[in-house]
Amino acid sequence: MASGRRAPRTGLLELRAGAGSGAGGERWQRVLLSLAEDVLTVSPADGDPGPEPGAPREQEPAQLNGAAEPGAGPPQLPEALLLQRRRVTVRKADAGGLGISIKGGRENKMPILISKIFKGLAADQTEALFVGDAILSVNGEDLSSATHDEAVQVLKKTGKEVVLEVKYMKDVSPYFKNSTGGTSVGWDSPPASPLQRQPSSPGPTPRNFSEAKHMSLKMAYVSKRCTPNDPEPRYLEICSADGQDTLFLRAKDEASARSWATAIQAQVNTLTPRVKDELQALLAATSTAGSQDIKQIGWLTEQLPSGGTAPTLALLTEKELLLYLSLPETREALSRPARTAPLIATRLVHSGPSKGSVPYDAELSFALRTGTRHGVDTHLFSVESPQELAAWTRQLVDGCHRAAEGVQEVSTACTWNGRPCSLSVHIDKGFTLWAAEPGAARAVLLRQPFEKLQMSSDDGASLLFLDFGGAEGEIQLDLHSCPKTIVFIIHSFLSAKVTRLGLLA
């Protein structure tokens, strides 16, 4: 009986394996990538290292994807592949068919075997079929007991898209010559902490490995990239949630890289609700966070002041944006984010394709500014899809408004005309200035609604200027510290009020 577990997607890519001798200074090794429901497996595959970026590309040896030359043997495939039933989708061109030859059949007491894969045709373009693969089914039709002629007829009747379920049958292919084993290659060298990359840099040189390696897809980071020597975005960077394992892969072209990135991210996304539930339980157990709900979680790529980038795990609650270097899996780790941005003092100032004033070259980027007692913190992030950008944009804007509606009022000590005072800003009642002399009664010195505020500004050091018009004109308040936090909160209150009015209009 067939298992309900979906057959993994497999294909050949190239893994950055270390320093090379060419102009690009990098060595690449062909590997078999296998994507299952919750794990990504990388196995060493046959074949010489691929060309470095910018170098002329040589004709690929026929045995990389099948024995297309007479007498050539199939690749020495990794043990991981020998144990797998794989489902491969082949999309046929208008001419040329599947581009395979088959042998075997019930009359020969053998399964239906792929004996030849023709270079450049549909099967070869999948990079996931191999000479020696047994075809178990075609579009769901069982071929396990088919004769050779029956299999030929089934394959001939297929449409433009053909789903083949296959399994590599090394033991029943004695007439195929084994090719020599591939060189060893590595992937699991821990990156520097925090995870940082120079612009378009693939990360540290990995250690060698000679057998399959497995990376959990639980909250893994997936990013499409290019390199200084090859501007085509056909590279993938994949990091484990704990930041200890990093893969830097090269696909044959941009379309292939995009397809793999989409498929891997889709599997990561299916695991995200479970991660969110686990973090929600940890968050509820912390004494400082209370019972805040997690509104959004995901990896962002942050532009660093040095010019590099870093994977940053962002966790958005009802009140804060918490940024981590890796997935927090304990209460202690969750309570110690690398940075925290209170939403009420945070503004989304850019979302979408970068502009000339924004020093970031990503098409899908957004910028946040947070008012603090030390000034304004600015952070630039990018995401991998328009859907992610839309989700983060909406959640951040809505989060700012929720925080404003939840807080309602803030107060700060200040000095006005030499008198010690207290400034209260309420989302509905507006601005109230109270006398705060020691021993004196708490008297209202000034009260103005938001509707009267014509302009606000600050000097970036300690002074806040509020212009309500009328007889008072502009008032000057000395907050005795950087006024940016209160300025950003005033803007959040105003934005929330405008949104509230828009919803009621």
Curated annotation (Swiss-Prot):
One of its GO terms (cellular component) is cytoskeleton. Keywords: Actin-binding, Calcium, Calmodulin-binding, Cell junction, Cell membrane, Cytoplasm, Cytoskeleton, Disease variant, Long QT syndrome, Membrane, Phosphoprotein, Repeat. The modification Phosphoserine is found at S101, S184, S189, S193, S200. The keyword Cell membrane applies. Residues 1-25, 40-77, 180-210 are annotated as: Disordered. Phosphorylated by CaM-kinase II. Phosphorylation may inhibit the interaction with DMD. The keyword Cell inner membrane does not apply. High expression in skeletal muscle and heart. Low expression in brain, pancreas, liver, kidney and lung. Not detected in placenta. PROSITE patterns: PDZ, PH_DOMAIN. Belongs to the syntrophin family. The PH 1 domain mediates the oligomerization in a calcium dependent manner, and the association with the phosphatidylinositol 4,5-bisphosphate. The PDZ domain binds to the last three or four amino acids of ion channels and receptor proteins. The association with dystrophin or related proteins probably leaves the PDZ domain available to recruit proteins to the membrane. Monomer and homodimer. Interacts with the other members of the syntrophin family SNTB1 and SNTB2; SGCG and SGCA of the dystrophin glycoprotein complex; NOS1; GRB2; the sodium channel proteins SCN4A and SCN5A; F-actin and calmodulin. Interacts with dystrophin protein DMD and related proteins DTNA and UTRN and with MAPK12, TGFA and GA. Interacts with MYOC; regulates muscle hypertrophy. Interacts with DTNB. PANTHER family: ALPHA-1-SYNTROPHIN, SYNTROPHIN. It is linked to Long QT syndrome 12: A heart disorder characterized by a prolonged QT interval on the ECG and polymorphic ventricular arrhythmias. They cause syncope and sudden death in response to exercise or emotional stress, and can present with a sentinel event of sudden cardiac death in infancy. This is Alpha-1-syntrophin.
